[in-house]
Regions:
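The feature captures the beta-strand-to-loop junction immediately N-terminal to the Walker
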Residues: 38-40
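ABC ATPase nucleotide-binding domains
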Residues: 73-85, 89-232
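Internal alpha/beta loop-helix hairpins
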Residues: 194-258, 304, 335-358
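Glycine/charge-rich catalytic "coupling/switch" loops of P-loop NTPases
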Residues: 254-297, 321-428, 454-477
Length: 477
């Protein structure tokens, strides 16, 4: 059995203001693996890396290195080195001295330093650069020096926090391949952080997809791309057509206005999310398609055309080596094994309400237009405002807990924030064929999911209009 070099057990990082950057995170990394933390900004990937390095201490949980706890161990006592996006090279030292710095701190003999520095210079293809100044190097060369300085100490684990972020596109692509080759030659464990899906797919043995401080999925690049576990992963990894639908029979699903044969055996009547990659969409003559539509957009991407087809309220994006004309009527065909079916997630929003001294329901300082006697079945209110149960006994409303639930499609967004029951900003959005699914991070530090047919922008400040008649109230004592 392969040995776990690093284990994270129920790791949580919560800051003084109550913000949870990482929540109940569990991970096992095998010796010699190249593993990548992938996710959008603010998902907790860098915080997790910093806890492995020892720069941050988890609020809860345990970190093990080769089976031994290192949660409280300071960074300098861990056999772990880190390469950051900003390489932090010493400008007053030449390349040789930059690389040798860590070895000198350890009081390594000079003859050993010479051998090790020469070896890593050869590894990063910088032989002959020993006496060069840092400011004479290109961005890619500086990045190699930073990696050489890290690996010369022979760490068991190398952490890389978006090290290619400062490079141009061509240099990034070259360095992706070079890093993968370095990993193969060194044989040490690489843990890499990026928001760039192409980097993750190109270099990794395993990818950990993160969102909002939680692991969404872990798997090989092929697993993550071909078998996303939820709509977030499908949307974040590569381009995807994502549709809500329902299973209509054995290996049959209806979505996007048509019925499709699929290979995922999900029970009939189950609400599903269907994922189809643009490269798997085949455009045909209208009569030959499973659904039909009109071409609304054609964009040349170099290696292919990106063609958008409107079918009713749905949009389907296809990639094709053949062009089309805007306004063309086309058929859309997808082979069964190119349809990925996931059981639909229940995104019902649940939040607490308070009962004020007047026995009125409040949320976020707003009185809700609903009588408490409507919420508490069988109750009635006296003239002095007391709430009595069906037996005539007074209810101590201070001991009641009221939960409100409301469906994403029943909430409306408004740019007049003060009109909303609660306010916040759009932190995530996914297009689902005939509508957008938004995550709103509110001022109360709660996330709401809202379905809306209109396109809003990331970071837009919005108010949430929530009709009382669409709310379901649950009473707990």
């Amino acid at each position: 059995m392969e040995q776990n070099i690093i284990e994270l057990k129920h790791i949580t990082k919560t800051y003084e203001d109550g913000f949870s950057a990482v929540s109940d995170f569990n991970l096992e990394v095998k010796k010699g693996e190249f593993i990548t933390f992938l996710g959008p900004s603010g998902c907790g990937k860098t915080t997790t890396l910093r806890m492995i390095a020892g720069f941050d201490i988890p609020t809860e949980g345990e970190i093990l290195l080769n089976g031994k706890p290192i949660t409280e161990l300071p960074p300098n006592e861990r056999p772990i080195n880190t390469v950051f996006q900003r390489y932090a090279l010493f400008p007053h030292m030449n390349i040789y001295e930059n690389i040798a710095f860590g070895l000198r701190q350890k009081k390594t003999p000079e003859n050993v330093i010479v051998k090790k520095v020469r070896k890593v210079l050869e590894l990063v293809d910088l032989e002959g650069f020993e006496k060069r100044r840092v400011d004479t190097l290109s961005g890619g060369q500086q990045q190699r020096v930073a990696i050489a300085r890290a690996v010369v100490n022979e760490p068991q684990i190398l952490l890389l926090d978006e090290p290619l972020g400062a490079l141009d596109l061509k240099m990034r692509k070259e360095m992706q391949l070079e890093l993968k080759e370095m990993h193969r030659e060194l044989g040490i464990t690489f843990i890499y952080v990026t928001h760039d899906q192409e980097e993750a797919l190109t270099m990794s043995d395993k990818i950990v997809v993160m969102a909002e401080g939680k692991m969404q999925q872990i798997g090989t690049p092929e697993d993550i791309y071909n078998e996303p576990i939820n709509a977030f992963v499908a949307d974040f990894i590569g381009d995807s057509n994502i549709f809500n639908g329902i299973m209509t029979g054995k290996l049959k699903a209806r979505f996007c206005g048509g019925e499709f044969v699929c290979v995922d055996d999900v029970e009939e009547g189950t609400h599903i999310t269907a994922v189809v990659r643009p490269e798997d969409v085949i455009l045909t003559e209208p009569a030959q398609g499973q659904i039909r539509g009109i071409v609304s957009s054609v964009i040349f991407k170099g290696m292919h055309y990106e063609i958008t087809v409107e079918s009713g309220k749905n949009e389907i994006v296809a990639q094709s080596v053949y062009s089309a004309k805007v306004g063309d009527r086309v058929g859309v065909h997808v082979d069964p094994d190119n349809i990925h079916i996931m059981i639909a997630e229940d995104h019902t929003n649940i939040f607490p309400a308070e009962i004020n001294k007047n026995n009125e329901l409040e949320y976020n300082g707003n009185v809700l237009d609903v009588a408490l006697t409507t919420v508490i079945k069988g109750s009635r209110q006296t003239e002095d405002g007391a709430i009595l149960d069906a037996n005539g006994s007074e209810i101590d409303t201070g001991k009641l807990r009221i939960k409100i639930s409301i469906k994403p499609q029943d909430i409306e967004l408004t740019d007049v924030q003060e009109e909303g029951l609660v306010q916040g900003y759009i932190s995530n959005l996914i297009y689902k064929g005939d509508h957008y699914s938004y995550v709103i991070h509110t001022d109360l530090e709660q996330d709401f999911v809202v379905d809306d047919e209109y396109l809003w922008n990331m970071e837009d400040q919005v108010g949430l209009l929530m009709p009382v008649e669409k709310m379901i109230f649950t009473v707990k004592k």
